[in-house]
Amino acid sequence: VSEAVGRKMINAARDSMKMGFVTGAEVLKKRALVQKISTGSENFDTLMDGGFETNAITECFGEFGSGKTQVGHILAVNTIKEDPEAYVVYLDTENTFRPERIIQLANGAGVDPDDALNRIMVARAYNSDHQMLLTEQVDGLVTEQGKKVKLVVVDSLTAHFRAEFVGR
């Protein structure tokens, strides 16, 4: 690809992303569409100002065994509970997704476990390149398959990058 063609491709991609300035009124209008996903814990939801926001990136971090994966599982079930048309994408980099746990949580939340499992789209990422590819494919779930993806869980976002890019 020549430099001129490459530049045209980059400019077309930028145009399609609508990057640039918007008015404060437009930001307010978009913020009105933001919803909160409950954790089911009143104290945790209070700490998170009502729950985890949609259209946002929220990182949970902590020591091994501190409950990060459980938060992802809980948010997945609660997203499905709160919106009967919602789908959840779960990008699993460390093979920690447990359908058995989803069943337990769904039963506890009064959600049909089969429905919950059918609306959680799980992909196992085997390295950082595969993780990036899967991330790019989420858009296709929405645009091509018409799925109302309301939550994307990446467990763990940094695991492959830490392992593959040591010291960088």
Model-identified regions with their sequence ranges:
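The Walker A/P-loop phosphate-binding site
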Residues: M9-D115, R119
